Amino acid sequence: MQKKAELYRGKAKTVYTTDDPDLLVLEFRNDTSALDGERIEQFDRKGMVNNKFNHFIMSKLAEAGIPTQMERLLSDTEVLVKKLDMVPVECVVRNRAAGSLVRRLGIEEGLVLNPPLFDLFLKNDAKHDPMVNESYCETFGWVSKEHLAEMKELSLKANEVLSKLFDDAGLILVDFKLEFGLFKGQIVLGDEFSPDGSRLWDKETLDKMDKDRFRQSLGGLIEAYEEVARRIGVILD
């Protein structure tokens, strides 16, 4: 397998084509963004940490029967993945109130949400990822009703698997986002799962162990990411 041309450069990852039309190389960079990409900084080791973290989580989800785009780890910062036709809508599962939900509804941060909330957002930085629903998806043709139902089912299944994984490590999985795509007609989990796209709190102290440390200028971003990785069993070095 040979890495070829750059296909897409996102806020924290770069995607490359390969000599296999069905496979891509995903490179995790040290960039960290907030405010829909308006604020970007670099942190040493972040690309490596997120790459290995994501590979670990995707492997756990695959073991649980959730189809993922993951093929294999290539290097400290690169992974080989299936080329998906991405759905332009992201799924968010919320176990506790935080972030935009608190701002939108004026509820207390940390409120337990039982059953968990399932939200949909259109992936559009210029419009600040507006919240949408199943009706929008059907009307605008973003994803079929059947595929959307599958995305919801897989998101909630991932929540069960990961909530237990983090709980066993002394962490609360507050919320997280997932992105899906189609591979040969099948819904497959793509993009990444890392502390960049999830909220993780320490069970005892409620300390934030995710990208909110960057968003809220709390400091210690990489130290928090590495601590979460260590607790769940990710081998970094």
Swiss-Prot record:
PROSITE patterns: SAICAR_SYNTHETASE_1 (PS01057), SAICAR_SYNTHETASE_2 (PS01058). The gene is purC. GO terms for molecular function: ATP binding; phosphoribosylaminoimidazolesuccinocarboxamide synthase activity. Belongs to the SAICAR synthetase family. One of its GO terms (cellular component) is cytosol. This is Phosphoribosylaminoimidazole-succinocarboxamide synthase. Transmembrane segments: none annotated. It holds the Pfam family SAICAR_synt. It comes from Photorhabdus laumondii subsp. laumondii (strain DSM 15139 / CIP 105565 / TT01) (Photorhabdus luminescens subsp. laumondii). Keywords: ATP-binding, Ligase, Nucleotide-binding, Purine biosynthesis. InterPro entries: SAICAR_synt/ADE2_N, SAICAR_synt_PurC, SAICAR_synth, SAICAR_synthetase, SAICAR_synthetase_CS. Its EC number is 6.3.2.6. Pathway: Purine metabolism; IMP biosynthesis via de novo pathway; 5-amino-1-(5-phospho-D-ribosyl)imidazole-4-carboxamide from 5-amino-1-(5-phospho-D-ribosyl)imidazole-4-carboxylate: step 1/2. The keyword Glycoprotein does not apply.
